[in-house]
Curated annotation (Swiss-Prot):
The gene is cysI. Binds 1 siroheme per subunit. This is Sulfite reductase [NADPH] hemoprotein beta-component. The keyword Amino-acid biosynthesis applies. Its cofactor is siroheme; [4Fe-4S] cluster. It comes from Shewanella putrefaciens (strain CN-32 / ATCC BAA-453). Keywords: 4Fe-4S, Amino-acid biosynthesis, Cysteine biosynthesis, Heme, Iron, Iron-sulfur, Metal-binding, NADP, Oxidoreductase. It catalyses: hydrogen sulfide + 3 NADP(+) + 3 H2O = sulfite + 3 NADPH + 4 H(+). [4Fe-4S] cluster binds at C429, C435, C474, C478. Belongs to the nitrite and sulfite reductase 4Fe-4S domain family. Its EC number is 1.8.1.2. One of its GO terms (cellular component) is sulfite reductase complex (NADPH).
Length: 565
């Protein structure tokens, strides 16, 4: 059998001189607001994507103008933690160097900027560098931002878990100096042709993106099973002793292509804390060497495990790590939501979790969220923690400072809004107008859609029940819709596929119930199901489990076989 032809991106990476390409030349060109096609792939490794305003696309075409190009830049913030001083720097960039004048908290515990003209990219990256922040490997075929449960209660355990997440992020960063040379004006050194430039990645990096998360049970806010590689903390007497390792999760799929599917990770066993780096590097290098480099739609680790088999993959990881997995330790995986309002930590410090709808931090009439966080940052002595539910925690507040912090939060609309259980458990991706992959609205439409869900729950007397609802504009799954009890995935303008049946805890995927339907049909379907749920549910039964038990959808046990079947 002849060897399959490599995907174009593989040649681009090989010929890029370790991610340099012609990015510098493209940056210096004022002829266009765009980069070349090849460099558009390479800039992802530097932390940003080229986009354009799709609302204006047709109008500009009629005017014989090129699309209104701009860039989305995503920062690397392992565990989502930054200082108040860093936040002030982040805020200033949004206010002065982006057309969106906003900050977007993401579903991977970091922030991103939208509406950056090409001419401002270098200034922004240099300004971030002054705050000890960067966007290296926030996108691209590398290990992305490492998530970690921000657990504001078990402060000591969080600190230990966060240290592991930070070490993972640092250890698995690309070694190339391309970022420093292009954006920070570091003098280029003579590059070598051997693999010592990238001892872990090599010249072609990974076949596809690679996502990693650290969970601290019982919380599963990081949706650990949706990640390529997950570490579920195991504690004894409040001390971290190791992790249950999971591998092979991922949300992305392609409409109409059944060989692509979302998947939850497999459990592989327990590892000691001191062996985390060995196993992380082993899993990642197996994916580097075994992953599909011909078809990018089948390049994620989940497909590598499916294609090669669980046992073969496990044996290879153990061989490369030089350590065997121990039997998985029993842990309880629970809520994926955030604890809103004030929570006291074991150290006596207080933590205020603020709900940020769809993660968009912007000043609006009656809700000056951006100004509010800026004012809090000016006086706060603790840290800011971004959550994977797109919210913000003002962490480490002394008891005597609570009233001042709360007063500012209420003054600027960061506190005091009516927040139902379901709204508090719901997230959406950005989608239109900036995401080039979006087929339908998400962030702009989602608040209105949740209003309808809230009204239906109130109608049937089930408002007390949290339901995990997620919406994306396409099936790439940035807001993890396939792990939602109610998942809506864009198919066309105003039309979505409706998915039901995921577990509340994030341990089972959902399954498509209705295809390509509009709002009225979605709400009518949910109206009927909520009515049944109100009278037929068992005590303590969640909505996702109910839809499976009564046969609305079948449980997805093995995604490769039954997600589409």
């Amino acid at each position: 059998m002849s060897e399959q032809k490599l995907a174009l991106n593989e040649y681009l990476k090989t010929d890029s001189d370790y991610l340099r390409g012609t990015i510098k030349e493209g940056l210096d060109s004022s002829v266009t607001g765009s980069f070349s096609d090849g460099d558009q792939q390479l800039i992802k490794f530097h932390g940003f994507y080229q986009q354009d305003d799709r609302d204006l696309r047709n109008e500009r075409k009629e005017q014989k103008l090129e699309p209104l190009y701009s860039f989305m830049l995503r920062a690397r913030v392992p565990g989502g933690i930054c200082s108040p001083q860093q936040w002030l720097g982040v805020d200033k960039i949004a206010s002065t160097l982006t057309s969106s004048n906003s900050i977007r908290l993401t579903t991977r515990q970091t922030f991103q900027y939208h509406g950056i003209p090409k001419r401002n990219l270098k200034t922004i990256i240099q300004d971030l560098d002054r705050q000890a922040l960067d966007s290296i490997a926030a996108c691209g075929d590398v290990n992305r931002n490492v998530m970690c449960n921000p657990n504001p209660v078990e402060s000591k355990l969080h600190e230990q878990a966060y240290a592991v997440a930070k070490k993972l992020s640092d250890h698995l960063l690309p070694h190339t100096r391309a970022y420093a040379e292009i954006w920070l004006d570091e003098e280029k050194l003579l590059t070598t042709e051997d693999e010592t430039v990238e001892p872990v990645y090599g010249k072609t990096y990974l076949p596809r993106k690679f996502k990693m998360a650290v969970a601290v049970p019982p919380d599963n806010d990081v949706d650990v099973y949706t990640n390529d590689l997950g570490f579920i903390a195991v504690a004894e007497n409040g001390e971290l002793v190791g992790f249950n390792l999971t591998a092979g999760g991922g949300m992305g799929s392609t409409h109409g292509e059944v060989e692509t599917f979302p998947r939850l990770a497999d459990d592989f066993g327990f590892i000691k804390t001191e062996d985390v780096m060995k196993f992380a590097e082993a899993v990642m290098t197996v994916q580097r060497d075994w992953g599909n480099r011909s078809n990018r739609k089948r390049s994620r680790l989940k497909y590598t495990i499916v294609d090669h088999g669980y046992e073969k993959f496990k044996a290879e990881v153990e061989a490369r790590a030089g350590v065997k997995f121990e039997p998985k330790r029993e842990v309880v995986i629970g809520d994926r939501g955030d604890r809103y309002g004030w929570v006291e930590g074991v150290d006596g410090k207080w933590h205020l979790t603020l709900f940020i709808e769809s993660g968009r931090i912007k000043d609006l009439p009656g809700q000056t969220l951006q100004t509010g966080l800026r004012e809090i940052a000016k006086i706060h002595k603790g840290d800011f923690r971004m959550t994977s539910n797109q919210n913000m925690i003002i962490a480490g507040v002394a008891a005597e400072d609570k009233a001042t912090i709360e007063g500012l939060a209420r003054k600027h609309g960061l506190l005091g809004q009516v927040l139902t259980q379901t709204r508090g458990h719901s997230i959406a991706c950005v989608a239109l107008p900036t995401c080039p992959l979006a087929m339908a609205e998400a962030e702009r439409y989602f608040p209105e859609f949740i209003d309808h869900i809230d009204a239906l729950q109130a109608k049937h007397g089930i408002s007390e029940q949290a339901i995990v609802v997620r919406m994306t504009g396409c099936p790439n799954g940035c807001a993890r819709p396939f792990a939602a009890e109610i998942g809506l995935v864009g198919k066309a303008p105003g039309r979505y596929n409706l998915y039901l049946g995921a577990s509340f805890e994030g341990t089972r995927l959902n399954k498509m119930h209705r295809e390509n339907i509009q709002e009225a049909d979605i709400l009518a379907e949910l109206d009927t199901l909520f009515g049944r749920y109100a009278v037929e549910r068992d005590a303590g039964e969640t909505f996702g489990n109910f839809t499976v038990r009564v046969g609305v959808v079948k449980a997805v046990i093995d995604a490769a076989k039954d997600f589409h079947g």
